[in-house]
A protein has these predicted regions:
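Bacterial N-terminal signal peptides
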Residues: 12-23
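Sec/Tat signal peptide C-region and signal peptidase I cleavage site
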Residues: 25-29
Length: 185
């Protein structure tokens, strides 16, 4: 049998086998979905930002503020800070570390990164010292993890959280950020 006829025969046989035995391409459809469970809302008090250069701002988190949820209540204690980097796209990338002291006296160390995509309106409100909300922004989501020695809150060492921005204000008299926090299941 000439080589070209053998090649055609093998190709035909392979094609028939694939069709007969039900070969299909891998599916690209979604196979799972994260579930979010509300954990708490918190308001962190902030000092005005220190501008290092056009791409880096540092914000100290002040003592006080609050965190409240169905099974948690507490306030922020020092140390705490937020390093904001302006990316080439104009988006802000957060790098945050804060300490939360619960009403039971337990310490929770939160660290998170995230992305802020401002609009002209949100930047104008921020510059004017006005409150801006999630409706003013294109995108503002962060992903905290928590470390603690607390028995009550030990489960937080084993879960990923998501912060969804609620509102903020940046002024000399009243600077804060507020988030709703969810456990990803």
């Amino acid at each position: 049998m000439p080589k070209s006829i053998g090649t055609i025969a093998r190709f035909t046989l392979a094609t028939f086998a694939l069709l007969f035995f039900g070969w299909s391409a891998p599916s690209l459809a979604q196979t799972t979905e994260p579930k979010l469970e509300y954990f708490m809302t918190y308001k962190a008090l902030l000092e005005p930002a220190y501008k290092i250069d056009d791409t880096l701002y540092i914000v100290n988190v002040l003592p006080g503020g609050w965190a409240k949820g169905p099974n948690i209540s507490g306030t922020f204690i020092p140390p705490g800070g937020d390093w904001l980097r302006v990316m080439p796209s104009g988006a802000f990338r957060l790098d945050v570390r804060v300490t939360l002291k619960t009403e039971e006296g337990d310490l929770l160390y939160l660290t998170y990164n995230g992305i802020i995509e401002h609009t002209e309106a949100s930047l104008a409100k921020q510059k004017a010292g006005e409150k801006y909300t999630h409706e003013d922004l294109t995108y503002f989501v962060t992903a905290p993890t928590i470390q603690t020695a607390s028995k009550k809150y030990a489960f937080l060492n084993r879960v990923q959280l998501i912060n969804k921005f609620v509102e903020a204000r940046r002024s000399r008299e009243d600077s804060y950020v507020m988030y709703d926090v969810f456990i990803v299941r």
